[in-house]
């Protein structure tokens, strides 16, 4: 989301200005590019992109679902945002950070990831 390298958002130099720049960048990008699926790995990026998408004319949240991950209380989530008259609906998903949580190939996470991935694929198949 923020196009500047940093080990974490907390360590990002000039964080406030960097996030403001990223919000404007994505706002402009999403007026010209109409993705059907966006996947994030942190809550801040998810919240920022959701806010930007919902600020588009006529956009509305069609459904929001949380998914267990097999890592205790850590969850993934997906929200479908309808954009009538603008573009096809977009599904915005958030996973726990993949460098910290092995979600794919881990037996305890497999049924949960299968359910999430099925939901994301359904969003791509819907017209």
Language model features with spans:
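Short, surface-exposed acidic-centric catalytic microdomains
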Residues: 1-11
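Hydrophobic alpha-helix-in-membranes signature
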Residues: 2, 34, 95-97
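A short beta-strand-loop-alpha-helix capping motif that often carries His-Thr
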Residues: 3-4, 38-49
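C-terminal capping/extension of enzyme domains
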Residues: 9-27, 47-127
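Proline-aspartate-enriched helix->loop->beta-strand connector
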Residues: 26-43
